[in-house]
């Protein structure tokens, strides 16, 4: 608590930040506060679920910093002394704005508790972007990192690959909030259901709303995953210059790095985890 006070004090944060939250809640999420006109704006970040008591006794809205959506909190109410208690679920290393007094209409309630409908365990057809050494397509019986592949073209691949599969949904889900949880992604993914773009996931919990695209019965699924170009540079470091797939002004070294000052990549450096790692699940959330 002393550390947090010093940190916020160095940023000229007002003392009311610390009075606005319960001491117990302050240890759960990191937070900051500012006023804009008549609005109180709180930014919170952390992991998991907690109930937070705010000094402001008004009606809160929750603003999602990733997609700009504005919703009512999943649960909120008044305390005996007139303050507002809000229940927030930030997931894994998530963030949200809780805003009081802003002239913004919520689009609905924040997603509630999740229940798994299905996990996709069938083999994936994966099509790799051309020009980076990977085969045109491969079949992944289960989701594994590209950098662990026995095929050097996949192992050192950098770029975008499209994972294709399908899933079935039962009847009776019309009007329900459905999403797809991608599990672990390295580094970012776009989701398409039945050919319709649903959203991009680049940070935990790597979950995309598919409510408008999914239907009862068979659904086609495409997940386009992109990584950084680091692995291809490391792979190219072992190749003669004329056989490399990348062009860069960085120096590439065959073997181990000998200098301590960063100036490029060496062929024996550790590869970055890449690809869709899953598990991929279809999720229903209470609204």
Segments the model singles out, each with a brief description of its role:
Residues 96-102, 165, 220-227:
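Short, hydrophobic/aromatic-enriched beta-strand segments in well-ordered soluble domains
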Residues 48, 215-217:
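A glycine-anchored, Pro-Gly-centered beta-turn/N-cap motif
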Residues 52, 167-194, 201, 221-225:
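Aromatic-lined ligand-binding clefts that engage carbohydrates, nucleic acids, or primary amines
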Residues 103-122, 126, 227-279:
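Glycine/proline-rich low-complexity spacer/linker segments in large multi-domain proteins
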Residues 1-160, 168-172, 210, 281-285:
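Carbohydrate-binding surfaces of carbohydrate-active enzymes
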Residues 77, 198-202:
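Short beta-strand segments within Ig-like beta-sandwich modules, predominantly Fibronectin type-III
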Residues 40, 163, 176-178:
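Structural beta-strand segments of beta-rich domains
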